[in-house]
């Protein structure tokens, strides 16, 4: 594969992870499936095309094809059996046929074509087949863009993994530049600068969709919460699951010789933490707290006085960013800035964003936990295979309790389902793992998590190996990958991990780091040696 084309595609893929809800008119819905909202689909499709052409001509780019094919067959096979089981037990075909026509726009065309061919089949039987094909395509595309995307990265850089990390660093740096530049405009908007407001009104429709879901999401403007290029402040938590490990790892294990370089690292950390606090959203704030706890655990396990010192500096910078965020919020609300008021607002911020996480009646928790419990009940009713990929929404009325249906957001979701139709409704669990459990059962959840669990253990072994050999270059990469991958998976407890495509990039880099070719060329961050017998 042409290395320049490969590098440009990978650079665009890494840089574009901030664009996770692109406008409808540029989406590739048929080819993108559930990932069509991500800009990452474009570089991925280019990568698939170039890889396919190169493989056809030279046959030397795909690595470990048998193992990947075996896993793909198992993954698709289990989810397909789950889907067949779900279609067999599905009790809502009549509701679909009697519901809005917009949810089955292509079905009349199928019926008309079959009629012309002289095949007069029962409409409900055709609906079953049509739904089966539709959701089987979803399963295939889901695998291609998730694990398939990670596999492409592994294959592209199998013989030159240090190049992959260099391009990744450049791409993430570009994404940060976009994130901060757009965030600056949004901060000016939050501070009531009219020119910033008018600028966002012009640009936002080109960045993400506007009020397409439930008639109100994503908002045209976010008047009280920072969100930068993302459609939802909570999505920043998924992005920061990569950015915070990226920055803090460089602070702890990177080159500390130049003061200007160190100042740049701490400035990036300050701005990243500040943006998290300005979201006033629980997901990114809880993620930041969790990542700091995880970082401390790693440092205590591999204790070094120097690392602990860096950790204290990191906490100090985050603390300063927290105080600055309170000052900014006070300024934008024209509040008094006395010490008593500042302490009050600090306590209120912590209570609203951290203290309410376990409360069932604070902020949107009632609706969130209602959907979570509904999916748990649904999964427990079919624990082995679930109800089938994409079929869970129809069960909402039967599995939500009367009390849960009274929450405002739940009522809006159910009303939207009646209006748009069952097949156009999502009603997700807002939790990656509970959602997969209800959709695909325990088997589907296991086959999904297996690669993550496997590579996390291998990364831990590699980290131990690098630590005992005092290999600072390798240690930096091993630490970042393990730290970031665990953080990305942790984000799945409050939202889907694929909200930001970065998790699949990190997964691909993790397999590349452990199983990539052990070349000895000089690396900008070290000389990767891999694990013996990896």
Question: Residue spans of the language-model regions?
Answer:
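Transmembrane alpha-helical segments and their membrane-water interfaces
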Residues: 46-60, 102-189
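Long extracytoplasmic/lumenal interhelical loops at the membrane interface
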Residues: 358-373, 377, 381, 385-440
């Amino acid at each position: 594969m042409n290395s320049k084309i490969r590098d440009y595609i990978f650079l665009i893929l890494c840089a574009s992870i901030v664009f996770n809800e692109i406008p409808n008119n540029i989406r590739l819905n048929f080819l993108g499936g559930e990932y069509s909202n991500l800009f990452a689909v474009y570089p991925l499709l280019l990568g698939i095309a170039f890889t396919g052409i190169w493989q056809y001509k030279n046959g030397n780019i795909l690595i470990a094809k048998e193992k990947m094919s075996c896993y793909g067959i198992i993954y698709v096979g289990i989810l397909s059996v789950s889907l067949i089981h779900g279609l067999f037990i599905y009790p809502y075909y009549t509701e679909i046929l009697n519901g809005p026509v917009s949810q089955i726009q292509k079905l009349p065309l199928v019926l008309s074509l079959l009629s012309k061919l002289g095949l007069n089949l029962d409409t409900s039987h055709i609906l079953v087949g049509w739904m089966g094909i539709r959701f089987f395509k979803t399963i295939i595309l889901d695998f291609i863009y998730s694990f398939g995307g990670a596999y492409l990265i592994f294959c592209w850089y199998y013989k030159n993994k240090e190049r992959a990390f260099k391009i990744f660093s450049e791409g993430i740096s570009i994404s940060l530049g976009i994130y901060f530049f757009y965030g600056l405009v949004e901060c000016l908007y939050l501070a009531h600068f009219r020119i910033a407001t008018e600028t966002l009104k012009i640009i936002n429709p080109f960045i993400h969709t506007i009020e397409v879901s439930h008639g109100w999401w994503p908002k045209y403007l976010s008047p009280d919460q920072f969100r930068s290029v993302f459609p939802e402040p909570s999505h920043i938590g998924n992005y920061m699951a990569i950015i915070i490990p990226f920055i803090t790892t460089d602070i702890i294990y990177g080159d500390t010789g130049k003061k200007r370089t160190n100042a740049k690292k701490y400035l990036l950390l300050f701005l990243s933490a500040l943006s998290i606090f300005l979201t006033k959203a629980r997901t990114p704030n809880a993620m930041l707290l969790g990542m700091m706890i995880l970082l401390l655990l790693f440092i205590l396990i591999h204790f070094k006085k120097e690392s602990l010192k860096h950790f204290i500096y990191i906490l100090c910078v985050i603390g300063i960013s927290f105080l600055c965020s309170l000052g900014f919020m006070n300024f934008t609300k024209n509040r008094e800035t006395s010490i008593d008021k500042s302490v009050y607002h600090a306590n209120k911020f912590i209570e609203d964003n951290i203290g309410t996480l376990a409360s069932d009646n604070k902020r949107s928790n009632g609706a969130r936990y209602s959907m979570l419990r509904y999916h748990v009940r649904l999964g427990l009713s079919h624990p082995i295979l679930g109800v089938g990929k994409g079929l869970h929404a129809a069960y909402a009325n039967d599995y939500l309790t009367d009390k849960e249906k009274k929450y405002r957001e739940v009522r809006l979701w159910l009303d939207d389902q009646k209006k748009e139709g069952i097949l156009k409704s999502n009603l997700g669990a807002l939790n990656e793992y509970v959602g997969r459990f209800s959709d695909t059962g325990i088997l589907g959840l296991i086959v999904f998590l297996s690669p993550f669990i496997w590579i996390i253990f291998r990364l831990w072994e590699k980290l131990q190996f690098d630590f005992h050999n005092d290999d600072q270059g390798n240690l930096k990469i091993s630490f970042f990958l393990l730290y970031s991958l665990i953080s990305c998976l942790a984000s799945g407890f409050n939202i889907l991990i694929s909200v930001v495509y970065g998790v699949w990039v990190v997964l691909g880099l993790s397999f590349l780091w452990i199983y990539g070719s052990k070349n000895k060329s000089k690396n900008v961050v070290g000389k990767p040696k891999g694990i013996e017998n990896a």
